Amino acid sequence: HGGTILFSARSPEFQTEEGMKKAADNMRYHGIEALVVIGGDGTYKGALDFASHHPEFPIIGIPGTIDNDIYGTDYTIGYDTAVNVAMEAIDKLRDTATSHGRCFVVEVMGRHAGYIALEVGIASGAEDILIPETPTDLDKIVEELQLAKKRGKKSSIIVVAEGDESGGAMETAKSIEGKTGFDTRVTILGHMQRGGSPTSRERLMAARFGYIAVKALLEGKTNVAVGIWKGEYTY
C-alpha cells in the first residue's frame, strides 16, 4: 500500500493556539497519551510548536520524506520506494531511447536535495546526473554526449534533480538540443514517485523506526526524533 492510510494535509488551523487546543482536547477525549509524528521539516516544526503549548503530551518524531533530507538521520521513510519507482521508469525509458536513438532528460523529485537523482542515476546507468549539491556545467555535458555519439552510442539518459541550478529537465533539454541538434525528449516523473508499494527495505526500516519510537516513549523521552546514524538506530 503506497501513500499513507493516515492521510496527510496542511492545516492552517493547527498553526493557531485555538487549533492546537482543539487538537489537545481531541487527544484527551480519545484517550491518546502521546504522539508519534511521521514526516519532514514541516511535521517536526508543527510537533515542536504543539509541544510548546501542550507539554503534557510526549512527542516522538519519525523521519518520513522521499527527499531523504532530514538532519540527524541517514535514511527517511519513503526514500527507497521513490528511488525504485524512478529506476523502473528510467529502465523503460532506456528501452525507447535506444530504439529511437534519442537523448532523454528525466527529472526526479527531491526539492533542494539530490539524493534521489544521484542514487537512481547511478543505479540506472545514466550518462549524466545533475544535482543541486554540485555545480552544473552544461557545456561539459554536451561535450561528453557528442563524444559518446562519435564512439557509436545511440542513446543517452540524463537524470536531473528538480532543484538543480540548470532549471530542471525542460531547460536542460533545450540547452542540449540547441547545442547538439540531438533528438531530445523530456520526462518529468513527478508525483508517481510518491506512490507505489513499499520496498522490502522500506518496510523493515519503518518497522524498526516504529519500535525505536515506542521504546523512546517508554523510557520517558519527549521532543526527540528517531533515526539511523552511521548504522546505529538513535533518538
Placement of each model-derived feature along the sequence:
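Short beta-strand elements at the ligand-binding edges of bilobed clamshell
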Residues: I70-A82, G196-R203
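Conserved beta-strand scaffold positions in the cores of enzyme catalytic domains, especially
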Residues: I5-L6, I59-G61, V105, I129, ...
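C-terminal non-catalytic interaction/assembly regions of soluble proteins
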Residues: I176-Y235
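Short, ordered loop/turn segments at secondary-structure junctions
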Residues: R10-S11, G40-T43, I62-N68, G110, ...
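Acidic/polar active-site rim loop that often engages polyanionic ligands
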Residues: I62-Y75, T98-S99
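Glycine-rich oxoanion-binding loops at beta->alpha junctions
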Residues: H1-V37, T43, Y75-N84, E88
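Accessory alpha-helical/coil subdomains and C-terminal extensions
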Residues: A34-G39, K45-D49, H54, Y79-D183
